[in-house]
Design a protein with these regions (language model features):
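Structural alpha-helical scaffold elements that stabilize or flank donor/cofactor-binding regions
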Residues: 38, 110-111
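Short acidic active-site motifs
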Residues: 107
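A donor-sugar binding/catalytic signature common to diverse glycosyltransferases
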Residues: 111-148
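Oxyanion-binding "anion nests"
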Residues: 45-94
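A nucleotide-sugar donor-handling region in carbohydrate enzymes
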Residues: 1-55
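A short acidic/histidine/glycine-rich donor-binding loop in glycosyltransferase catalytic cores
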Residues: 137, 152-157
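Active-site donor-binding acidic/aromatic loop of nucleotide-activated sugar
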Residues: 96-104
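Leloir-type glycosyltransferase catalytic cores
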Residues: 23, 155-196
Length: 196
């Protein structure tokens, strides 16, 4: 209290909200990834996997790909070269899953924005999905972004569970979404800085 921190602390929201929205505008004007992959808006699910427990254990990785293959829905999977090699050396990929090279940020955010759903084990992508108003399925047993689960826009699924495809298909977030991470965050921050 002596330092005056309480009087000079302000809740503005998460700067990532503005970052995603501003970079999405750039991505939509510059990225050609949607045309390059020949996919239409909300015609595919976007998959990202990078956590050791999902990609280093060949049994879990194979299980996840087989479960996702059962959905029959098109899945775009930008895959790390090490994971791609493991997949190629171990088993075949279901026909509905298209492996692509890892994508740069603008191409990736364009893919996120056009996806029907996002399936991930990433922390940051869960939040990006929420900001972009995309249903998110997180292949983990916990999340650092509990708000996204509380708001019913993020479904946690244990990667070793069965019937993952049916759980994904039946997941439907509410129509309305609250701004749990804030809005106009940069504007609020600038106003506070200018007023100090």
């Amino acid at each position: 209290a002596k330092e005056g921190l309480a009087e000079n602390s302000f809740l503005t929201g998460d700067i990532m909200v503005d970052t995603v929205k501003n970079n999405l505008e750039i991505a939509l004007s510059k990225s050609t990834i949607i045309q390059d992959l020949q996919v239409a808006n909300e015609e595919y699910n976007l998959l990202t996997l990078h956590r050791n427990y999902n990609v280093d254990d060949t049994n879990i990785l194979e299980h996840l790909l087989n479960e996702l293959g059962e959905s029959g829905e098109k899945i775009i999977f930008p895959v790390h070269p090490r994971t791609r090699k493991m997949i190629a050396d171990t088993y075949s990929v279901p026909k509905n899953i298209e492996l692509t090279d890892p994508q740069g940020y603008f191409d990736f955010i364009a893919l996120e924005n056009s996806a029907k759903r996002i399936i991930t084990d990433s922390g940051g992508i869960q939040k990006e999905a929420y900001i972009l108003k995309k249903p998110c399925i997180t292949l983990r047993t916990e999340t650092e972004w509990v708000e996204t689960v509380d708001e019913k826009w993020n479904l946690l699924i244990n990667p070793s569970e069965k019937n993952i495809a049916s759980k994904i298909a039946s997941f439907s977030p509410p129509e309305n979404q609250r701004d749990v991470f804030g809005k106009n965050v940069t504007e609020k921050m600038l106003k506070i800085i200018n007023d100090i």
